[in-house]
Each structure stands twice: as C-alpha cells, then as structure tokens.
C-alpha cells in the first residue's frame, strides 16, 4: 500500500506515521489490493472551507473530505482495487483539517490523534464507495468505521505500538446519531 501524507495545515500535533498506519490498516482489512495508492493531506481552515464550498456547496470549514478517483460500490468486485484482477491503483485523496478536528476532539473528550484516526478511517470508507446518505448506509458505514478503528487499536497493542491511549469515553466510537449530536456542538463537521 502506498500512502502519501502531505501536511499543509501548519498545525502542531499531526502524527503522519499514525495516520498512514491507520489508513493502511483499514484498507488492508477491506482487502484492497496492496498496490493501491492514496494521499492524505492535512490543510488549514481556509483551505478546507474553500474545498467544502467548491465541491459540496456548503459554507464553512469541515473535518474531512474524500475525493475518490473512481466511483466504487461497497462490496462490488468489478473494477475495484481489491478485485481478483486489480482495478485502478489510485484510490483517491483524503483531506483532513486538524484545527477543525481539534474542536471536535475537545467536544468529544478525546485526543486530536484519535479524532484524526477516526476521520482517516471515515475517509478511507468514502474512497471505497461507502456513504451515509440513508439510515441503512449510516448504520453500515459507522459500524464498519468503529469496528476498523477499534480493531486497529488492538492491532497496535499486539505490535507493541502506541500513538495514544485507546479512548473509552462514550463519544470515542460514535454511531451516526451520536456523531450528529457532536456536529451540533461543533457546527460544520458532518461526517
């Protein structure tokens, strides 16, 4: 798996190694072809706000945006990078805003590192065609997101690696409804 990280945010506390690790773990668990590529870019509030209005027609900053190279259907095989005959090698781009994520982490009672890991897994799922526009999609995507994130922490422990303690608070592994409540506290998120 080739994952490039670019930090254009100017924000302290962004752990490049951790974000590449969680992204690689999530994509590996989803059987994505090991030759697949993606990029994670950390940007500032102005940049994410500009992208948000340009691509989503929504004003203000947000936490994460994903730009898949190809439109994929979750679980489908034709043309996917995890198909027997590998599809496109470039999955796309995940754009994170650490400054916005810090606001969410503070409101949720956990670290910036955990919030960025959660947002990275969320972005990976979007790159693979998952979405949360319906209640059924929300349930599937947030369930898978939380499972992957929790399993990643277990994998880290098994490897003897620790980027930050696994949070145990009620907002650490939110379902869609819990995340919607957090978005009311920190307007603009909306993962």
From Swiss-Prot:
EC number, UniProt record: 3.1.-.-
Pfam family, one: YbeY
UniProt remark on cofactor binding: Binds 1 zinc ion.
HAMAP family linked to this entry: Endoribonucl_YbeY (MF_00009)
Compositional bias of kind Basic and acidic residues: 176-191
InterPro entries per record: MetalPrtase_cat_dom_sf_prd, YbeY, YbeY_CS
Descriptive protein name: Endoribonuclease YbeY
Cell compartment(s), UniProt: Cytoplasm
Residues annotated to bind Zn(2+): 122, 126, 132
Cellular component per GO, a single term: cytoplasm
């Amino acid at each position: 798996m080739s994952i490039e990280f670019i930090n254009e945010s100017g924000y302290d506390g962004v752990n490049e190694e951790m974000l590449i690790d969680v992204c690689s773990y999530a994509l590996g668990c989803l059987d994505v072809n090991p030759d697949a590529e993606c990029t994670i870019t950390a940007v500032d509030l102005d940049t994410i706000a500009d992208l948000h209005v340009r691509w989503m027609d929504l004003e203000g900053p947000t936490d994460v945006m994903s730009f898949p190279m190809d439109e994929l259907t979750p679980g489908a095989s034709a043309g996917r990078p995890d198909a027997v005959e590998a599809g496109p090698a470039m999955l796309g781009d995940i754009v994170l805003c650490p400054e916005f994520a810090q606001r969410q982490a503070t409101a949720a009672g956990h670290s910036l590192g955990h919030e960025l890991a959660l947002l990275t897994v969320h972005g990976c799922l979007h790159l693979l065609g998952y979405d949360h526009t319906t209640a059924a999609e929300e349930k599937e995507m947030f369930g898978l997101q939380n499972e992957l994130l929790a399993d990643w922490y277990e994998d880290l422990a098994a490897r003897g690696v620790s980027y930050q303690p696994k949070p145990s608070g009620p907002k650490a592994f939110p379902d869609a409804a819990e995340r919607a409540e957090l978005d009311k506290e920190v307007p603009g998120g909306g993962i």
